[in-house]
Regions:
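N-terminal secretory/membrane targeting signals
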Residues: 1-23
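Polar/charged low-complexity regulatory segments
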Residues: 23-24, 29-35, 43-228, 232-235, ...
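Serine-esterase "nucleophile elbow" of acetyl-processing enzymes
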Residues: 39
Length: 302
């Protein structure tokens, strides 16, 4: 969207310059005078400067708005939300994204500016139409069902690389699934020590019991919500995705605390580095422990 607007501004500049040059030939002063020509050139220079300034301000406007949102509270709730309590609870599955964005947690509207929201969808998810939105959201639905937690638990028990490789060969028929699981096992071994140290999980057993489904459920809810607000999908379509995420989360998780831990575990298995995991852990602690957190106001149970 930004690109289209910038293109329009440049096109307007070109049109203005063309009209100014045409005016130069239509409006003549007595022969030998360059006053008219100089005046036209001056106006063109002013127009160029104006467009450059406008484009620059436009490009940084949303960054400034994003910066100003950082001064809002951690938990922005709309007291006049039109959603039912149950619908608000489901929206809170995407709370991590809303806290990061300093946006609303309990409504379909995110609080993001239209241009910022649509640019993010296009840049990060290649979403700019109904079809592309459905493709991306269906992909996230599939990701919600890809749970390798039991396999990671077995790998923790086996410890040795060769034993784990044999286990994967014996377990998976599809080599792509085996490869994906192996990658998650590698990441689990890499980060389990820090996650225990940070108090996210007690041990390897809790890591594999909780799993990472909340990470994918969070993304599905947050992206479906943004797509609905941007009119790429209908609200009815959005709720189908949200309901699916809710069902997947409740298959293995029973509390907001477990859901929060599961988000960090999923972030780890997805490939986040130590810094990003530290940041997501801070947000989860706020959501779990802060008395003002909406996770304290709404039960996780249906």
């Amino acid at each position: 969207m930004k690109k289209k607007t910038i293109f329009c501004l440049i096109a307007m500049l070109g049109l203005f310059s063309q009209q100014a040059l045409a005016l130069r030939f239509r409006v003549r002063v007595p022969s030998g005078s360059s006053e008219s020509s100089n005046g036209v050139v001056t106006w063109i220079v002013y127009a160029v400067i104006a467009v450059v300034v406008a484009v620059t301000l436009y490009r940084y406007f949303f960054k400034i708005r994003g910066f100003l949102r950082q001064f809002k509270g951690d938990f922005l709730m709309d007291e006049n939300s039109s959603l039912s309590k149950e619908q608000q609870r489901k929206m809170l599955l995407g709370a991590v994204y809303a806290v990061i964005d300093k946006g609303y947690l309990n409504t379909i509207k995110t609080g993001l500016e239209k241009e910022e929201r649509e640019d993010r969808l296009e840049r990060d998810w290649n979403i700019c139409t109904h079809d592309s939105a459905v493709d991306a959201l269906n992909g996230l639905k599939v990701a919600c069902t890809k749970d390798y937690s039991p396999n990671i638990g077995e790998a923790f028990k086996l410890k040795e690389q060769k034993a784990i490789e044999k286990y994967l060969r014996d377990t998976f028929v599809n080599p792509n699934d085996a490869k994906a699981c192996a990658k998650q096992i590698e990441r689990a071994f890499k980060h389990i020590g820090n996650l225990v140290k940070e108090g996210i999980v007690r041990d390897e057993a809790e890591f594999s019991r909780i799993g990472g489904v909340a990470f994918e459920a969070t993304r599905l809810v947050a992206i479906a919500r943004m797509c609905a607000e941007s009119k790429y999908i209908s609200e009815q379509e959005m709720w189908k995705y949200v309901d699916f995420a809710d069902e997947q989360a409740h298959k293995s998780l029973t509390s907001w605390e477990d859901y929060g831990k599961s988000y960090v575990i999923g972030d780890c298995l997805w490939g986040a580095d130590s810094y990003d995991l530290g940041q997501s852990s801070k947000i989860i602690r706020k959501l779990i422990n802060d008395p003002k957190s909406p996770w304290k106001l709404f039960l996780f149970e249906k």
